[in-house]
Amino acid sequence: MNTYIMFTDMVGYSKLTGDDQNLALELLKEHDKIIEPIIEKNEGSIVKRIGDAIVAIFNKSEKIIDSSIEIQTALKKRNISNTKSRQIIIRIGLHYGDVVLKNNEVYGLGYDIASNIEPI
C-alpha cells in the first residue's frame, strides 16, 4: 500500500543509555508522552517501535507535515526549561511510498527510504 511514512529517532539516546540508563528511560517516557498524542491527533498510526525510534503512517500529506511540525515545536518548548543533559532532540524522516504491514512489522522500499532520510 502507498502511504506517508514517518520515522523518528532521539539524538544521542544510545550514548545516554550507556551513561545514565535511568535518565535515558525517563526521557524516553517523556518523549513518548509528547509524540504519541500528536501523531494520533493528526490521524497517524504508530506501526513500529525500535528502542527510541517510532515508525508511523499517515493517509494524508498535510497530516504528516502538521504532525512533524507540532512534534518539533512541542519539543522545542519543552527543552527551553531543561538543561542540556535533559533535552529531547529528535530527527524525523518523511517519505511517501509503498510499504507492507505484516505481523506488526513494516517492510518495503518506502520504509527503507524514510529510515534512511531521518539521519540526514
Pin down the residues of each PLM region.
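Catalytic beta-strand-to-alpha-helix segment of the class III nucleotidyl cyclase homology domain
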Residues: 55-120
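Catalytic NTP-binding/metal-coordinating core of nucleotidyl cyclase/transferase enzymes
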Residues: 1-70, 74-77
